A protein has these predicted regions:
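Short loop/turn segments immediately following beta-strands, especially the blade-tip
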Residues: 149-159
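Short consensus segments that form the blades of beta-propeller domains
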Residues: 105-108, 133-139
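Acidic, small-residue rich beta-repeat scaffolds with periodic aromatic anchors
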Residues: 20-86, 152, 165-211
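Structural motif
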Residues: 137-146, 202-209
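Signature of short aromatic-glycine-proline-rich micro-motifs recurring in repeat-based ectodomains
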Residues: 103-117
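Short beta-strand elements that form the blades of beta-propeller/WD-repeat-like
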Residues: 125-133, 193-198
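Structural signature of eukaryotic scaffold interfaces centered on beta-propeller domains
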Residues: 117-123, 186-190
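Classical Sec-dependent N-terminal signal peptides that target proteins to the secretory pathway
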Residues: 2-21
């Protein structure tokens, strides 16, 4: 009887050891390091994304100019992390069949929409974004934004007035082209030239050099 109990204990100990070994190898994930600010900047420049997700269209919408005003926009720089993690842009976005990353929201009881499509990137790290916005009526305002990413220092003080300096990813609007209401013309980026096709606003193709 003692021999039998000894065998049972040995078998139980062996199974327990094997289970722990397997758990340590397969089920216990190694903690992942947070990406450096340099990696974050690299991803933004490569994919117009932040930590694996497309930048929320609400962040790009900050560059919009009120119809009653003229450019440049009041807001020309956006802290990307603060924007994508804010309560203001908690809602999901969707990608339309024609490639626009957009979202819908209500403002003063009216349904609004804003979306952007990355046309490409030119020299100097300038991203070309074709955008469309609507709200409350039939107008669909179409605007091309020129955006560029960079790192900037942000200084903050705690309750003991200790200074902390943190590098942040900043998206800046460095230019824009108004296309008008529901422009039907094509939009292409050829080398460093932005080519706007014929439309109800243009009788011939227009080429804008972005060098």
């Amino acid at each position: 009887m003692k021999i039998l109990w000894t065998l049972v204990i040995l078998v139980s100990f062996t199974v327990s050891s094997i289970s722990k070994d397997n758990l340590s190898e397969t089920d216990v994930a190694e903690p992942q390091e947070a990406p450096s600010v340099e990696d974050v900047l690299k991803e933004a420049n490569k994919s117009f994304a932040y930590k694996g997700k497309a930048i929320h269209p609400g962040c790009v919408e900050q560059f919009m100019v009120n119809l009653a005003d003229s450019p440049p926009p009041i807001v020309r720089a956006v802290d990307v992390e603060s924007c994508v993690s804010s309560n203001e842009f908690f809602m999901d976005y969707k990608v339309s069949e024609d490639g626009y990353i957009g979202y819908e929201y209500e403002d003063s009881g009216e349904k609004n929409y804003f979306g952007y499509k990355v046309i490409g990137k030119v020299k100097g790290g300038i991203h070309i974004l074709d955008t469309r916005a609507s709200g409350g009526g039939t107008m669909v305002a179409m605007t091309v934004f020129l955006a560029r990413f960079g790192l900037e220092n942000y200084r903050s003080f705690d309750q003991q007035e200790k200074l902390t300096i943190e590098q942040r990813l900043i998206m800046k609007c460095i230019g824009q082209i108004d296309r008008g209401d529901r422009d039907i013309g094509s939009l292409e980026l050829i080398n460093n030239n932005l080519v706007l096709g014929e439309s109800q606003y243009r009788k011939k193709v227009e080429v804008i050099n972005l060098d």
